[in-house]
Amino acid sequence: MLDANILIRATLGRRVRRIISAHEPSAEFLTPNTAYEEARKHLPALVKKRAVIHRGMDGNLDTLTPPVSVLDRDVYTPAGARALARIGDRDPDDWPVLACALALDYPVWTEDRNFFGTGVATWTTDRVELYFNEPAAS
């Protein structure tokens, strides 16, 4: 389950995009519509702040779909109360990412420390390939 900061990194950088491309054939990359819209909201300012088109990326979030699938509210709303209870006051705006992870039993890929301690496996970019390279459970 991708957080908005991972979507931004995938759009503006190379490392996250490379990881997604490398594992796309065998992994499913999902994000709630709220994280997608949050990334869309912040990207123009980030592109402008950098004053250049970063490494050939144009800041266009839509270049990620596919391989990233955007989930609608009906997927994560049933787990919303559990997600809000777990993420608490840390960042209540992130509850949809956590709710998706809870509803679908997926880990979260983020750089945001607010997801740690929520009861869902949480991976940062520097460690996520360990997850992708683990042998599948029998």
Question: Could you say what each language-model-derived stretch is?
Answer:
Residues S69-P107, E111-R113:
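Active-site neighborhoods of divalent-metal-dependent phosphate/nucleic-acid chemistry enzymes
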Residues L30-P32, L102-S138:
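Acidic, PIN/NYN-like endoribonuclease modules and their adjacent C-terminal/linker elements
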Residues R14-R18, L43-A45, W123-T124:
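Short, glycine/charged-enriched secondary-structure capping and boundary segments
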Residues D58, D89, E129:
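Divalent-cation
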Residues H23-S26, N33-R82:
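PIN-domain endoribonuclease scaffold, especially VapC-family toxins
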Residues M1-T31:
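Short, well-structured N-terminal submotif of metal-dependent ribonuclease cores
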Residues L7-I8, E37, F115-G117:
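Short, active-site-adjacent cap segments at secondary-structure transitions
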